[in-house]
Design a protein with these regions (language model features):
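ER/secretory pathway lumenal C-terminal domains and tails of membrane proteins involved
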Residues: 1-4, 16-211
């Protein structure tokens, strides 16, 4: 594995051997193991924010009061709000950007202006498609394997061929859990610098549509 990867796992049969390898055998202590079964709890999220052995903490920017027990356990997906939001951006674009950011469907803006808003009525996901913007320079620095169709390109031509954003569909999904939000937060903040892996134990319901 590359340096400082993050492994999402879910079952004891996967997690305990990984912990043993790090704790006892001192193998790959730069790898961060995140058990999604525990990631719904505030104490575990706090642990994951902190460095462990040679691995930095997970890129989670949340304050403790935003993930404490009983907060944001489930957040409703409300795509019907898109019409109102888009109407606001058409009629009052400056006010809309001040209220919800340049792209109201970017995950960072959804968390900031909706999920973690002071007003309880804003604690929803106002779309069925979430956007994560791609730092193209970071992608190229990472050395990751690019799609075969663009591998032959060079320079600006290659950079232009990389999509501007990653869109994740929430179609037919009515609720996101705290764990779902956590994974989206990590994906948005990794910036192609820390590779993400999922153990085979992670069920489809825990993957959103990452695969």
């Amino acid at each position: 594995l590359p340096i400082y990867p993050i492994i999402f796992c879910e079952g004891d049969n996967d997690t305990f051997p990984l912990w043993y390898n790090q704790d006892t055998e001192e193998v790959r202590r730069d790898v961060r193991i995140c058990n999604l079964s525990y990631a719904q709890t505030d104490w575990y999220i706090y642990q994951q924010q902190c460095p462990l052995y040679d691995a930095p903490g997970l890129p989670i920017s949340w304050d403790q009061n935003q993930y404490q027990e009983g907060k944001n356990e489930y957040v409703a997906v409300r795509p019907e709000l898109k019409k109102q939001i888009e109407a606001l951006y058409q009629k009052h674009p400056e006010e809309a950007r001040d209220s919800f950011g340049n792209d109201p469907y970017e995950i960072k803006n959804i968390l900031k202006y909706w999920v973690f808003a002071e007003k309880q009525e804003f604690h929803v996901i106002p779309t069925d498609t979430i956007n994560i913007y791609i730092d193209k320079d970071a992608v190229l620095r990472s050395g990751m394997m690019l799609p075969e169709a663009i591998r032959h390109l060079k320079g600006e031509e290659l950079r232009d061929a990389i999509p501007d954003k990653l869109s994740i569909s929430l179609k037919n999904i009515r609720l996101l859990t705290k764990v779902d939000l956590l994974m989206l937060e990590i994906l948005a903040n990794c910036n192609w610098e820390r590779p993400l892996y999922m153990a085979i134990s992670v069920g489809n319901s825990s993957k959103l549509k990452f695969d």
